[in-house]
């Protein structure tokens, strides 16, 4: 979110893939 764009993006992508 703040200062962790890459980490957050990776998490979001993983969440989407899991769905």
Curated annotation (Swiss-Prot):
It comes from Staphylococcus intermedius. One of its GO terms (biological process) is killing of cells of another organism. Belongs to the neutral sphingomyelinase family. It catalyses: a sphingomyelin + H2O = phosphocholine + an N-acylsphing-4-enine + H(+). It is an enzyme of class 3 (hydrolase). One of its GO terms (molecular function) is toxin activity. This is Sphingomyelinase C. Keywords: Cytolysis, Hemolysis, Hydrolase, Magnesium, Toxin, Virulence. Monomer. Its EC number is 3.1.4.12.
């Amino acid at each position: 979110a703040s200062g962790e764009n890459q980490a957050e993006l990776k998490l979001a992508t993983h969440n989407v893939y899991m769905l």
